[in-house]
Design a protein with these regions (language model features):
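Hydrophobic/aromatic-rich alpha-helical bundle segments in the mid-to-C-terminal region
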Residues: 116-120, 136-186
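Short hydrophobic/aromatic patch on the recognition helix
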Residues: 36-47
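Amphipathic alpha-helical segments enriched in hydrophobic/aromatic and basic residues
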Residues: 19-22, 28-29, 39, 50-61, ...
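Hydrophobic alpha-helical connector segments
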Residues: 56, 70-97, 147-151, 170-174
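Hydrophobic/aromatic residues within well-ordered alpha-helical segments
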Residues: 7, 50, 57, 61, ...
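Basic, helix-initiating cap at the start of DNA-binding domains
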Residues: 1-22, 26-31, 35, 52
Length: 186
């Protein structure tokens, strides 16, 4: 790895940590530079402004999520759908740092058009991938899109609220399976 790549990686690591620990308002180019032990001009060489830095952090997390989803082969049975739902709900519980980053981006998107557009494109991609995964189980395009929207929306919301629910995730997964199955087979 080159010195430039090392420096860029360090900037992203420090910026990600600041975003997790201090949120959007605590993430400044100057704090990143100080925490990384490099000059502000070096940080600005790689990222001209905070939006560029936020997008680079998002690229790391969102690309990982999309890559993982794209590895999922199209489902051939509702048993496979149940396993997918269960794994997604469990994953939402296990990846607290990632969820913290997502929640921060959701908040930022309410006041930052660039990040809002970035999230729109990300969820559009996730929706398309989930449609591809569910397609073999669907009776038509309308039910496919409705089911994908239900699944994506629920899993994303569950990543925020799931740990506070007094119901086991397996029970939630079974209930969600029935809702998605009902939507897919209408």
């Amino acid at each position: 790895m080159t010195k430039q790549n090392d420096k860029n990686k360090k900037i992203l690591q420090v910026a990600t940590q600041l975003l997790k620990s201090e949120g959007d308002m605590g993430l400044t180019m100057r704090k990143v530079a100080t925490s990384a032990g490099i000059s502000l001009s070096n940080v600005q060489y790689y990222y001209t402004n905070k939006n560029a830095l936020l997008q680079a952090i998002a690229d790391q997390y969102f690309d990982d999520c999309v890559t993982q989803l794209k590895q999922q082969t199209p489902l051939e049975s509702f048993e496979q759908l149940h396993m997918l739902i269960t794994s997604q709900l469990n994953y939402a519980h296990e990846v607290s740092d990632m969820c913290r980053i997502f929640r921060e981006y959701w908040a930022i998107s309410t006041r930052n058009d660039d990040i809002n557009e970035y999230l729109r494109r990300y969820y559009e991609t996730v929706f398309t991938v989930i449609c591809d995964v569910l397609r073999p189980l669907s009776s038509d395009d309308y039910t496919l899109k409705t089911s994908a929207a239900l699944l994506v929306s629920f899993v994303e919301g569950y990543s925020v609220t799931g740990k506070f629910m007094p119901v086991e995730s397996e029970r939630i997964a079974s209930t969600l399976l029935e809702a998605v199955r009902g939507s897919l087979t209408k």
